[in-house]
Amino acid sequence: MNAMAVYTKVSEAELTAFLENYDLGALVSFQGIREGIENSNYFVTTTAGRFILTLFEKRVKPDELPYFLNLMTHLNRKGIACPLTVVGKDGLNLRDLCGRKACLTTFLNGKSARDITPACCAELGAAMARMHLAGSDYPADRANDLSVDGWAALLDKIGAAADTVEAGLAKEMAADYADIKRNFPSGLPRGVIHADLFPDNVFFENGKLSGVIDFYFACNDALAYEVAICLNAWCFDAGSWRFNPDKARAMTAAYQSIRPLNAAEKAALPVLARGAALRFSLTRTFDWLNRVPDALVTPKDPAEYIAKLRFHRSVSDASVYGV
């Protein structure tokens, strides 16, 4: 279904006891969700319907969880198709399960696009812009801990081990980081971004975007940085990892039909896109090198984002991205 995983195993007895906190009827079935890299997730079916159970794992700080959960409520009320947290009999939407903070969210219909077309990219671009506008009055603030300073920390943690992924990679990524940091823009329009708008986190029905899930990287950052993330995630062809300008034009045109980028945002897109590619190169390399034994999870191959990073290194004009 989506970009999720299982690190913490939940038994039927534990889940049954957990569900007693809710008016959701009896447990019918549950199944771990294999895809993704963050948190532990299960499909849960009760006599009242279908839900997603999330147990929050390594990168999520418990005191930041209200930011994510309340954001989904805020966006949903503004007409954005995203999950809602389920409130228990005690009025709480967050509680403990198996030593982790956990919540239930509503189940969204639809599925991820496996064949990403320019039409899919246009749907995504428009939805992203609507989400940016809908989040403009969200009162909470959360820094992006996987922005430029966070990349430096990841580089240090990975160190020379990057060369076991590809010879010379440690030096290459360090040089990219230094150049990106030197040229990284400031003062761009900011707001709430999803920060993980990958195809696995976006659902479609009958060719139309039907929902966005997995808001647990959401933060306040430059809105154009989200556009850059999506250029990476949506606008390269699967397998070859070649940049597809038709997809990029479709996405950026649809975005700008709702929220036009200003001149500074357009000029910054090449370095933002390169920075986004580095960010995912680093996290994928780190996760590849630090796999969790026995976890029901599929690590992402960092080679894809290393290839994208090399592409963006050659781009100096944002017109390449269709703006």
Q: What residues fall within each predicted segment?
A:
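Active-site acidic catalytic loop and adjacent metal/ATP-binding pocket
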Residues: 34-47, 52-53, 85, 178-225
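ATP/Mg2+ or Mg2+-diphosphate-binding catalytic cores
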Residues: 3, 145, 157, 280-323
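A cross-family kinase active-site recognition segment
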Residues: 114-168, 188-190, 296-299
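ATP-binding pocket architecture of kinase catalytic cores
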Residues: 46-140
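An alpha-helical support segment within catalytic cores of ATP-dependent transferases
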Residues: 8-21, 139-140, 152-195, 205, ...
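Conserved NTP-binding catalytic cores of kinases and kinase-like/nucleotidyltransferase enzymes
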Residues: 1-89, 208, 321-323
